[in-house]
């Protein structure tokens, strides 16, 4: 379908909208997990999948021949396994972006995936994941002629998009498009009205500053952003700038944001490289939040206490996620929610 979803009344709902399920993919890419090895990566993904499965069904995409390891680590936990050839395991970025309309019908956007600006040689199988998910869910299909990853934007479901210039305006994504043209694609394919641009993401983020590491919507008119109090940290000024932008911004409904902050954990290195650790990178499930812990007791505890405060009515589950982040992303990056919907004709 060549026309955009917004024309048909479709929009991406906020992540707190009820979910049908969560989609994940089983680790398989040796280069991605070279710091810790595939076995540890699989155990880390299993922890995330089982934590989410407390709240909603999880469907796990697994490379043919790797079903046994997924079954052994995830069996009996409200987790379905589907065999599908894949290159990597980041469904936030490679899976479909699901939309609904006012009749609660389901649609899916299939973006172009180029492995985060060409970081990896082969992403041909991952470029097919979105269309497979859309077919599996019997959703209405929309192809977007835009290189895009799901971790590069957040929505509030009420007309507002949050994203970063470092990623979306990067010359390794859509160099032929202007900022205005990219904005129009986002508005048309996510069913929105207004875009708030932050500038820079975390130092060393191989995704070029994905928004799901630095800021997110937590409720209508409310955002959570990452900060650091350490003025010597190279992230300090860029995170402070993001905070100031959010404080002075209004959403599509004209509300000035209520801005909450969570402090990033101390700088952590693995094989000489700093990991991009962030408590912002969590998954919001049905009545539950699955958030990371990094082994820093005071930072982990303060983040947990904040989440209890800002997510009333949700059960907060905090899990050891350092191994997930060693691959270059976090809990939000390895998950993709499918909103509850009615099938066409129901």
From Swiss-Prot:
Give the protein family.
Belongs to the agmatine deiminase family.
SUPFAM superfamilies, sorted: Pentein (SSF55909)
Alphabetic keyword roster? Hydrolase
Entry GO MF terms = agmatine deiminase activity; protein-arginine deiminase activity
**Under what name is this protein listed?**
Putative agmatine deiminase
- Indicate whether Plastid appears among the record's keywords: no
- The EC designation for this entry is 3.5.3.12
Source organism per UniProt: Legionella pneumophila (strain Paris)
- Enzyme superclass (EC): hydrolase
Q: Which reaction does it catalyse?
A: agmatine + H2O = N-carbamoylputrescine + NH4(+)
Tell me the superkingdom of the source. Bacteria
The active site is formed by: 333
Note the HAMAP family from the entry: Agmatine_deimin
Q: Which biological process annotations from GO are given for this protein?
A: putrescine biosynthetic process
Show the InterPro entries listed in the entry.
Agmatine_deiminase (IPR017754), Peptidyl-Arg-deiminase_porph (IPR007466)
């Amino acid at each position: 379908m060549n026309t955009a979803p917004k024309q048909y009344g479709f929009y991406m709902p906020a992540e707190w909208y009820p979910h049908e399920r969560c989609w994940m993919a089983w680790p398989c890419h040796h280069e991605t997990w070279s710091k810790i090895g595939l076995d540890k990566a699989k155990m880390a993904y299993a922890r995330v999948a089982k934590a989410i499965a407390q709240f909603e069904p999880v469907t796990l995409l697994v490379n043919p021949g790797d079903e046994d390891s997924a079954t052994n680590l995830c069996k009996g936990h409200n987790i379905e396994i589907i065999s599908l050839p894949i290159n990597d395991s980041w469904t936030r970025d490679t899976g479909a972006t699901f939309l609904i309309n006012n009749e609660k019908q389901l649609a899916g956007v299939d973006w172009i995936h180029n492995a985060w600006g060409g970081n990896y040689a082969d992403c041909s199988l991952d470029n097919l994941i979105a269309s497979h998910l859309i077919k599996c869910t019997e959703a209405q299909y929309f192809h977007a002629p835009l290189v895009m990853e799901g971790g590069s934007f957040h929505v509030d479901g009420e007309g507002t998009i949050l994203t970063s210039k470092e990623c979306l305006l990067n010359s390794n994504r859509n160099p032929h498009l202007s900022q205005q043209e990219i904005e129009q694609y986002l508005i048309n394919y996510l069913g929105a009205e207004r875009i708030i641009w932050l500038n820079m993401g975390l130092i060393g983020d191989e995704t070029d500053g994905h928004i799901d590491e630095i800021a997110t919507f937590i409720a209508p008119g409310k955002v959570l952003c990452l900060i650091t109090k350490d003025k010597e940290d190279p992230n300090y000024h860029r995170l402070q700038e993001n905070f100031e932008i959010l404080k002075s911004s209004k959403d599509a409904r004209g509300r000035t944001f209520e801005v909450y902050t969570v402090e990033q954990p101390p700088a952590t290195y693995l094989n000489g490289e700093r990991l991009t650790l962030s408590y912002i990178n969590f998954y919001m499930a049905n009545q539950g939040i699955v958030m990371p812990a990094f082994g820093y007791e005071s930072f982990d505890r303060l983040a947990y206490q904040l989440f209890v405060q800002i997510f009333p009515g949700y059960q907060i589950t905090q899990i050891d996620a350092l191994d997930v982040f060693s691959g270059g992303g976090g809990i939000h990056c390895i998950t993709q929610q499918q909103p509850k919907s009615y099938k066409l004709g129901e």
